Curated annotation (Swiss-Prot):
It comes from Plasmodium chabaudi chabaudi. It is found in: Nucleus. Component of the RNA polymerase II (Pol II) complex consisting of 12 subunits. One of its GO terms (cellular component) is RNA polymerase II, core complex. DNA-dependent RNA polymerase catalyzes the transcription of DNA into RNA using the four ribonucleoside triphosphates as substrates. Component of RNA polymerase II which synthesizes mRNA precursors and many functional non-coding RNAs. Pol II is the central component of the basal RNA polymerase II transcription machinery. It is composed of mobile elements that move relative to each other. RPB11 is part of the core element with the central large cleft. Belongs to the archaeal Rpo11/eukaryotic RPB11/RPC19 RNA polymerase subunit family. This is Probable DNA-directed RNA polymerase II subunit RPB11. PROSITE patterns: RNA_POL_L_13KD. The keyword Nucleus applies. The keyword Metal-binding does not apply. Its main location: nucleus. GO terms for molecular function: DNA binding; DNA-directed RNA polymerase activity; protein dimerization activity.
C-alpha cells in the first residue's frame, strides 16, 4: 500500500535554495505607515520566534510580531513598529545580537564538553 503524496507540496530544493535573482529579505511599509514589514525567504518559525522575542525586549520597539503567511511557503513576515528608529537598523541589530548569543552558547558548550572529556578521561570513560 503506497502513501499518498501532497500534490501542492513544494519541491525540496525550493525549500532550501533561494532562486537566482531573488532577495532574501524584502521590506515594506504598512498601509498606515507606522510599521515595517519584513518578508524573509527560506526561514520558518524557528528564526521568526527568536527575532520576535529579541525585538519585544528592545526598548526601541513598540510592537513586534511574526507570522508564516502560508504553511507551504518557506517564508516568514516580521512586523516591527519602532519608536522613532529605523526598522531596518533595529532588525539588523537584533539579528546580530542573536548571532552573538548563539556564538557564545556554542563556545560555552564546546568548552564544557572538552572539560567533561578531560575530567572523565582518567576514569576510562568516553
Amino acid at each position: 500500500m503506497s502513501v499518498p503524496t501532497l500534490s501542492n507540496k513544494p519541491e525540496n530544493v525550493d525549500l532550501l535554495v533561494l532562486p537566482h535573482g531573488e532577495e532574501k529579505v524584502k521590506c515594506q511599509i504598512s498601509d498606515k505607515g507606522d510599521c515595517n514589514i519584513f518578508t524573509i525567504k527560506l526561514e520558518d518559525h524557528t528564526i521568526g520566534n527568536l527575532i520576535k522575542q529579541s525585538l519585544c525586549q528592545d526598548p526601541k520597539v513598540t510592537f513586534a510580531a511574526y507570522r508564516q503567511p502560508h504553511p507551504l511557503q518557506n517564508a516568514i513576515e516580521i512586523t516591527i513598529r519602532p519608536k522613532g528608529y529605523a526598522g531596518v537598523k533595529l532588525l539588523s541589530d537584533n539579528v546580530h545580537s542573536i548571532l552573538n548569543q548563539v556564538s557564545t552558547l556554542r563556545e560555552t558548550f564546546a568548552n564544557r564538553v572538552q572539560k567533561y572529556k578531560e575530567k572523565n578521561a582518567y576514569h576510562g570513560n568516553r
